[in-house]
Amino acid sequence: RRIQLTPGTTTVFVTHDQEEALAVADRIGVMNKGKIEQIAAPQNLYQRPATEYVATFIGLTNRLPGASNGDEAVVFGQRVPLLAGSAKVESGAVLVRPESLTLALAGSSDSHVGERARVEVIHFLGSLVRVDTVITSGEYQRWNKGEQLKATVQLPASELPAGLAVGDDVIVTPRPVAALAC
């Protein structure tokens, strides 16, 4: 990175490693089937993807049932801001990053809103924890072309409910932050 920042130096990287690209690039071009989908700074690509392809290619993305209501999206019955100029996806779907969701053990005082889910996998990543869940609420069980609806939640390790284990019932809730696309 130090060499890249030397005045007058131009570098071009070609990589399939999204984390590497986000870490070393000032601008990133995302290609899909030989066509450029978006060129932008790493933070803009991640936070404001121009297309559904870019949103799912750069970072983890949940495709959840939801609806757009002007500048808001409704996800699991909760209103969340919709990013201005958000990418368009098929009707009835909203794209949400894992860090834009939270969870609580079902039946706890923190579990009053959201959708019931079952914990499938817990990935401890040091300061972060990624929890893969399967939505078990009747309305959404078979939403995505007959497949089980899954939601990945990523949160600081300090926010992980004490004693959370694979197989536990939880409530997944969107945080009051912007959805990527609708």
Predicted regions and their residues:
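Non-catalytic connector elements of ABC transporters
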Residues: 61, 71-182
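Gly/Ser/Thr-rich helix-start
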Residues: 30, 35, 56, 60, ...
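Residue-level signal for well-ordered alpha-helical positions
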Residues: 27, 57, 107-108
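ABC ATPase nucleotide-binding domains
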Residues: 1-53
